[in-house]
Amino acid sequence: MSLHIMAMAFMLCDHLWGTIVPGNDWLTCIGRIAFPIYAFLLVEGYFHTKNLKKYVGRILLFAILSEIPFNLAMGSSLFYPVHQNVLWSFLISLGLIHWNEKAKQNGKIWLRCLVGGISLLLGYVVGLITMVDFYHAGILTVLVFYFLRQKKWWSYAAQFLCLWYINWEMLGGFSYELQMFGQTRFVVRQGFALLALFPIWLYRGQQGYHSKWLQIVYYLFYPLHLLILGLIKFL
């Protein structure tokens, strides 16, 4: 539960910056932490759900419900075809994860490696073509947590390196100039996403307090806060 609440709070900060409180960069810096946590929770949800069809169905339902609120908040329009909400990113990712799990059942190492490699390529291409939130980088982030789920020191190191490359090199973007020891250094704003690894690594796979109503709140938060922010922009 704590990871969900953290992710919701960080996402709200980022969306406040992107809609009604521009210029407060600290909001988007800490907001970068949200997506990797959600990506991690998506993978955990895949493995812990009691009914995969219902799990995917809920995400699909809220992806549809969130589209207009997302368009209003991020595009100031009911129709915003150049950017889709993050739940579509998650649906694509779940499809690729499920494909890999089916390949695992076959038991052949070569097939698992082949499907894994094709999944990374498909995630990259489909993420760009569909223009889902975080594009190719978002889907690859989910796959990083899927392929490196072993909770070993080497998987943690690989997660760090992969997320560093995805956020620092692949996404890049705006950077802050720092003076350190007489040298100029640049810190990429998107790089703050790596801070998400600390609470993720502390996760021990134990579910906290859970209820049906709390689950509904988690899902409703995304479209509702976007709708509110989108409407405030027009006031």
Residues of each region from the PLM?
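Alpha-helical transmembrane segments and their immediate juxtamembrane cytosolic regions
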Residues: M1-L235
